[in-house]
């Protein structure tokens, strides 16, 4: 399952590691070091999935604020949150705000890949379900 993924993290090494891991699996990736750049990239071309770090230095908003912005504009965009300083409360807050899931750094590559695959699959199924519901009244009308 190939997708276009935006990676937002203030640490270049983390962005590169995630990007290489995903590219090795056939995904196309784009990287942003802060919320401002992420918003610009999202506005230009919404991806299939976004991976957002919660704590970003030198950014005009943190990952939870960016998540709120993303969900306000792209409510169906799957978002996976990552953090090296996360707590259970932070993870719960992110999921309540619409994140698909939360991964704590450091993480294993296979865990990241599984989360990305599951988030993209859930998004695809939600989209297909909405399309079927939209067609259902047409198909059930008597001739």
List the predicted regions and their residue ranges.
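Flexible nucleotide-interacting loop at or near the entrance of a catalytic core
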Residues: 111-143
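C-terminal output helix
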Residues: 87-89, 103, 107-117
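Charged docking surfaces used in two-component/phosphorelay signaling
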Residues: 16-24
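Active-site beta3 strand of CheY-like receiver
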Residues: 45-51, 56
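Short amphipathic alpha-helix used as the core "switch/output" element in two-component signaling
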Residues: 39-40, 62-76, 93
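Short hydrophobic/Thr-rich beta-strand motif most characteristic of the beta2 strand and flanking loop
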Residues: 26-36, 41, 60
